[in-house]
């Protein structure tokens, strides 16, 4: 239990560090940081579940004169659980703020584009008629406006298109991260179900009088299934990591 507790402490420290960085650099933080926080949250939840299961087993197997030790483990579990809930809530709030800032910037860019187009249209409509006296000045002004338009508008349009591309890329990465997180949660839930089924099956087999050798064979088969499960989980995490590394 101490090893699991130390592992949970490291995960909590990493989570708080990433959340602090995300909060400090809310606008400029890379999308990969959100993926790292989501992955750490899922791993932290898994560690808490394992710690809770070991604590239950400790309560069953320990004697009654270890109340102080039980209280220590219970306090650790409550503290870690509360830290996990707080971190999860803070991450949700930061993602909401991040989305609001992006939406506001996008709206501002659209309004700026509309204002610029309106100004250019008014200039064209309100332009004075050309006279022989002002041909030279008009040609000079027209040339100057053409140069300014050629220098300014393409740059603005390029920045706006680049911003639009980044927004679409961020939205796509958000969907990928959400799918990965949901897949991890589904896998975690399936693992918990398998653990409960294994415990119930073992008890039922003992009640039915099945030999220990048969139960051991069943447990070996379950171990192989768990191994396949953890390999799949590792491949999924690696896939998410490479996606974030490639697009981040």
UniProtKB/Swiss-Prot annotation:
One of its GO terms (biological process) is protein transport. Residues 248 are vesicular. GO terms for cellular component: endoplasmic reticulum membrane; ER to Golgi transport vesicle membrane; Golgi membrane; late endosome membrane; SNARE complex. The keyword Ribosomal protein does not apply. GO terms for molecular function: SNAP receptor activity; SNARE binding. Pfam families: V-SNARE_C. Its main location: Golgi. It is a single-pass type IV membrane protein. Residues 1-226 are cytoplasmic. The keyword DNA repair does not apply. It is found in: Golgi apparatus membrane; Endoplasmic reticulum membrane. Keywords: Endoplasmic reticulum, ER-Golgi transport, Golgi apparatus, Membrane, Protein transport, Transmembrane, Transmembrane helix, Transport. The chain crosses the membrane at residues 227-247. SNARE required for protein transport between the ER and the Golgi complex. Belongs to the BOS1 family. This is Protein transport protein BOS1. It comes from Kluyveromyces lactis (strain ATCC 8585 / CBS 2359 / DSM 70799 / NBRC 1267 / NRRL Y-1140 / WM37) (Yeast).
């Amino acid at each position: 239990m101490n090893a699991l507790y130390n592992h949970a402490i490291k995960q909590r420290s990493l989570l708080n560090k990433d959340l602090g960085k995300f909060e400090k650099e809310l606008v400029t933080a890379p999308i990969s940081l959100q993926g790292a926080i989501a992955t750490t949250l899922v791993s932290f939840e898994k560690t808490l579940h394992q710690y809770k299961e070991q604590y239950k087993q400790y309560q069953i197997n320990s004697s009654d004169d270890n109340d102080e030790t039980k209280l220590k483990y219970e306090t650790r579990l409550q503290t870690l659980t509360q830290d996990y809930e707080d971190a999860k809530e803070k991450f949700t709030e930061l993602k909401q703020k991040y989305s609001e800032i992006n939406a506001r910037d996008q709206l501002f860019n659209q309004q700026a584009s509309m204002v610029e187009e309106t100004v250019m249209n008014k200039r064209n409509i309100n332009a004075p008629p050309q006279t022989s006296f002002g041909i030279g000045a008009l040609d000079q002004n027209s040339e100057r406006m053409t140069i300014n338009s050629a220098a300014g508008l393409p740059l603005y349009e390029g920045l706006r298109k680049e911003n639009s591309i980044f927004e679409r890329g961020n939205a796509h990465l958000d969907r990928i991260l959400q799918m990965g997180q949901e897949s991890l949660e589904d896998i975690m839930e399936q693992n918990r179900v398998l653990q409960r089924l294994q415990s119930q099956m073992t008890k039922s087999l003992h009640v039915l009088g099945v030999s220990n050798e048969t139960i051991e064979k069943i447990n070996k088969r379950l171990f192989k299934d768990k191994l396949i499960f953890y390999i799949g989980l590792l491949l999924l995490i690696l896939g998410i990591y490479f996606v974030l590394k490639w697009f981040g």
